[in-house]
Amino acid sequence: MASSTGHLIGGFAGGLSSAVALQPLDLLKTRFQQTKGGTLWQTVKSLDTPWQLWRGTLPSAIRTSVGSALYLSSLNLMRTALAKRKQFDTADSVVTGKSSNLPQLSMYENLVTGAFARGTVGYITMPITIIKVRYESTLYNYKSIAEAAKSIAAQEGIRGFFRGFGPTCLRDAPYSGLYVLLYEKLKHTLPTILPKSLLQLDSEGRYTAYTSTAINSTSAILSASMATTVTAPFDTIKTRMQLEPTKFKTFWSTLTTIVTQEHPIKIFSGLSMRLTRKALSAGIAWGIYEELIKHFM
């Protein structure tokens, strides 16, 4: 098994790379969700320069890189502990796959550990998430991260930094649980349906870096797409509560307002952008993470 340092570095590098590369999709999603009407094209045309697509990159990069490092490290600790307990009970060695050095667990264990790790880390990183969303939005004209933090603290207090944690947790915990479950399942299913000519093995009987990266990244993209679609309504509600806290105060009032005063389909607002971003982000982050931790064995 890779060291804890390896998981921290792998998670940080993967999260940072995906955050910087995909920030434009995140910004467009935030601005599209804050509007009651309009189209994605109108959102794009409202930008003054192409560089505005990367507004909020710093808080996004901090949140995603640190959050990814903490999440993947804590997830690994929990999954490894469960695997070692099973090893102790059965006197077997910890099982890993040909494309991965991560321990293999049951579907239920993958679901629970993924959800719990994400919920915990999500709470820790909630303040930077609030700053990121406000910074990306056109409803606030913050000139710096420091100004955003001071404004939130002065006007809303400490609670302002945790605004919308309920729907955020309802989005992220189920998403991560479903993601880990599907990801681990697909890593073992894909090799059985891919042409044998594409599956290259090294001298130790494991997949080569090219093959394992292709399998892991494809599994990540497919898993993220499915989990993102299921949890999309919570993302819309979370964004509304964080952008307009005086108008959208609770989960249920926000949901009711969107459905009755706008349109039920609006709870899936920004799904196409989030779907694209989450799928690509997972493919990049987990592909990098899986390969980096192999160097810390």
Curated annotation (Swiss-Prot):
The protein's predominant localisation is mitochondrion
A molecular-function term among this protein's GO annotations: glycine transmembrane transporter activity
Record keywords: Membrane, Mitochondrion, Mitochondrion inner membrane, Repeat, Transmembrane, Transmembrane helix, Transport
User: What HAMAP family does this protein's entry cite?
Assistant: SLC25A38
List the Gene3D superfamilies hit by this protein, alphabetically.
Answer: Mitochondrial carrier domain
The role this protein plays is: Mitochondrial glycine transporter that imports glycine into the mitochondrial matrix. Plays an important role in providing glycine for the first enzymatic step in heme biosynthesis, the condensation of glycine with succinyl-CoA to produce 5-aminolevulinate (ALA) in the mitochondrial matrix.
Q: What is this protein called?
A: Mitochondrial glycine transporter
Subcellular location per UniProt equals: Mitochondrion inner membrane
Tell me the ranges holding the Solcar repeats. 5-81, 105-189, 211-295
User: Where would you find the membrane-spanning parts of this chain?
Assistant: 8-33, 56-82, 111-136, 164-187, 215-241, 270-288
Q: How does it sit in the membrane?
A: Multi-pass membrane protein
- What SUPFAM superfamilies does this protein map onto? Mitochondrial carrier
Q: Which domain of life is it from?
A: Eukaryota
The family line of this record is:
Belongs to the mitochondrial carrier (TC 2.A.29) family. SLC25A38 subfamily.
